[in-house]
Structure formats: structure tokens, C-alpha cells
A protein has these predicted regions:
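Bacterial N-terminal signal peptides that target proteins for export
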Residues: 1-11
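The canonical Cys-X-X-Cys-His
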Residues: 42-50, 106, 142-152, 205
């Protein structure tokens, strides 16, 4: 009886492996997220929202939804390599050791999301923000944001999507670009631009972007 039970258990295991391999071979499970990737995705959503919409609170969490995959992966790499300043609340153990494949899985997941933006910026500044975004500030040698981020702020490649980004987060990033992201790959372009913008111009840009979808 013991021999029969052992034989049966071994047969069950072999069949399970065979079916698993068959599923992989025909591609039926190719797009299923791996368990570790799924847990990372859920971890991100704990702070950035179930739809990646960001979080308004004492610690503002940026919108990740719809972000360009290349930019998303670059930022995860920057955190891991410490070329982007890390806020104290980030659990870096979750970023260090993250494989390129896992970064790609996270980027793919969030790039496909597009919930409605929170808005929240002063509406009377939206028109001014739109003008700066589309035309720049020539007298301050500030180019149009749209030149790199796209006419609708959707981003492309390594240039971030800005549409729908949380109002306070955009303000914080533009104000603190040099101190927090001085080693960023885009710093040579963005740091001088951010420094050339006045506080009122930064607020107007952030207001405009907060309503874009």
C-alpha cells in the first residue's frame, strides 16, 4: 500500500510538471504575471493607488498610471543606483536587487492604466500654465515643455508623461529638481529650466497638468 501511494504521488507530480511545461510551450501562460512581480505591483499600489492614480496626503505619492515604460524603468534604476535622491519613506529593499525583467513588468503594468486625474490645481491658473507648457518662457530662455513631453503631455521614450500628475507633486519636483535629482540622466536639461521658472509659473504649470488626461 505504501508503494502504491508513493507511486501515485510521483505520477501526480510528473503529470503536473508536464502540463505546466505544455502550457508554457503553447504560450498560454506567457503573459501571466509571475508571483514576485505581482507582489511588487501590489506593493506599489499600496502607496500610489489601486489604479496608479497617486495619493494626496501628508506624503504625496506621484501618479504612475500611463507613465512611459522607458521613463518608469529609468527611475527605478536611478533609485537603485542612488542617482536619484531617495525620500525617507521609500523602502529601498524593495528596489535594490530588482531585476531588469521585474522593472519591465512594473512599467508595463502601470503604463496601461489611465484613471481620471485628480485635478486640484487652481483653475484660474490653467490657461497660464497651458501657455507656458505650449510656448515656454522665451524671455527666461525656457523652452516649451511640449517640445519634449508632447503636446498633450503624454511623454515619449525617456521623457516623462506629465498629464494628470498630482498638483503638489509637480510643484515639489520643479522646485527641488537640483537638490533631489541632480544626478538624474535628464538633469542637464531640466535643472536649468526648473531654476529659470518663477514660483508662480511653476504653480501655473502644475495646475494645468493636474487636469490633463
Amino acid at each position: 500500500m505504501k508503494f502504491i501511494g508513493l507511486h501515485s504521488a510521483l505520477l501526480t507530480t510528473i503529470l503536473a510538471i508536464a502540463f505546466s511545461l505544455a502550457g508554457s510551450a503553447d504560450g498560454s501562460g506567457r503573459n501571466a504575471p509571475r508571483p514576485r512581480a505581482s507582489s511588487k505591483i501590489e506593493y506599489c499600489k499600496d502607496c500610489h493607488g489601486a489604479s496608479g492614480q497617486g495619493y494626496h496626503g501628508y506624503l504625496v505619492m506621484p501618479r504612475l498610471a500611463g507613465q512611459t515604460p522607458e521613463y518608469f524603468e529609468n527611475q527605478l534604476r536611478a533609485f537603485a543606483e542612488r542617482t536619484r535622491e531617495r525620500a525617507l519613506f521609500i523602502n529601498m529593499a524593495r528596489v535594490h536587487g530588482m531585476s531588469p525583467e521585474m522593472r519591465a513588468a512594473l512599467a508595463t503594468q502601470f503604463s496601461g492604466l489611465n484613471p481620471s486625474p485628480f485635478g486640484g490645481g487652481p483653475r484660474h491658473l490653467v490657461a497660464t500654465g497651458r501657455q507656458i507648457f505650449q510656448e515656454g518662457v522665451p524671455e527666461a530662455n525656457v523652452p516649451a515643455c511640449a517640445a519634449c513631453h508632447g503636446p498633450e503631455a503624454q511623454g515619449e521614450g525617456p521623457n516623462a508623461r506629465l498629464a494628470g500628475q498630482l498638483f503638489p507633486y509637480t510643484i515639489k519636483e520643479l522646485k527641488n529638481w537640483s537638490s533631489e535629482r541632480g544626478a538624474d540622466s535628464q538633469a542637464a536639461i531640466m535643472a536649468p529650466i526648473a531654476r529659470a521658472l518663477s514660483e508662480s509659473q511653476i504653480v501655473a504649470i502644475a495646475a494645468y497638468l493636474s487636469y490633463l488626461k
